[in-house]
């Protein structure tokens, strides 16, 4: 697993996360086209997805369901939403893990 697709609409946070992951040997791609995330996912063909819930034009729950229809790639939700209901929903829709912001990079790694 070396290619990680980061779907985070906060460009600063996405860049910081990408740099941290690249520093330990991962290749990363930050989402660019929030109108066509599924198509971008298919083009990127990642080994892992890091997915926020609150996104422009969609939400991470819906995108997770769409990804699950075409791929079994691991999906880690990283979000500021810390309710147990959101965590349960994320995992029941196909997410593999759920981490709340602010998060610790060692925990993520």
Name every feature range the model reports, one short phrase each.
Residues 1-109:
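N-terminal/domain-start alpha-helical segments
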């Amino acid at each position: 697993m070396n290619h990680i697709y980061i779907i985070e609409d906060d460009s600063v946070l996405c860049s910081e996360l990408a740099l941290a992951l690249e520093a330990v040997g991962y290749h990363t791609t930050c989402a660019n086209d929030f109108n066509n995330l599924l198509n971008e996912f298919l083009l990127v063909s990642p080994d892992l997805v890091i997915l926020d819930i609150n996104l422009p034009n969609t939400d991470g729950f819906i995108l997770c369901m769409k990804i699950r229809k075409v791929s079994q790639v691991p999906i880690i939700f990283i979000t500021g939403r810390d309710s147990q209901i959101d965590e349960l929903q994320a995992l029941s829709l196909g997410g593999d893990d759920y981490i709340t912001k602010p998060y610790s990079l060692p925990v993520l790694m």
